Amino acid sequence: MSEHLPYYPPPIVLVVENDIFERLFKAASLRRQGFEVFEAADVAEAVTVLKNIAVDLLISDISLVDGAVLAQLAKEHQPTTQITWTLDSRQSFVETTVVH
């Protein structure tokens, strides 16, 4: 009798980034690591995803217009979602994580 390992779906990540190259790079990197990734270019797109998909992790550019609003809306729609803020990697900034 063969034993089967339980199936665990990959964590779902929402990448919110208005710079298309940054967004594509981050999303592709996460997909290579086995994450299921959704992308949004702005707060409105992100809220649409948050209303329809159970997101485990939200990764957003800290300089995004209405970023604070996005964090509030994310916590309202999905209180258990973790939020990570990033800065433009082309400027060699370090990723910063906000713990809630």
Residue positions per predicted region:
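Conserved phosphotransfer microenvironments
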Residues: 59-78, 88-95
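Conserved dinucleotide-binding and phosphotransfer motif residues
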Residues: 32-33, 77
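Non-catalytic signal-transmission and effector/linker regions of two-component phosphorelay proteins
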Residues: 1-18, 23, 27, 44, ...
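Alpha-helical interaction/dimerization surfaces of two-component signaling modules
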Residues: 28-30, 49
